[in-house]
């Protein structure tokens, strides 16, 4: 039971850190390369 409580307390922290890092990475990519989803399709 102690292991289950440890798991339930660690998983939200790890997922929060992961999603925060992913959001920051996506924000920085969009800052450095704005409209990256549009340019490759209309550059030909």
Swiss-Prot record:
Pfam families: PSI_PsaJ
Keyword Membrane: yes
Domain of life: Eukaryota
Coiled coil: none
Keywords: Chloroplast, Membrane, Photosynthesis, Photosystem I, Plastid, Thylakoid, Transmembrane, Transmembrane helix
GO BP: photosynthesis
Subcellular location: Plastid, Chloroplast thylakoid membrane
Family the UniProt entry places it in: Belongs to the PsaJ family.
General function of this protein: May help in the organization of the PsaE and PsaF subunits.
Protein name: Photosystem I reaction center subunit IX
Lineage, top ranks: Eukaryota, Viridiplantae, Streptophyta, Embryophyta, Tracheophyta
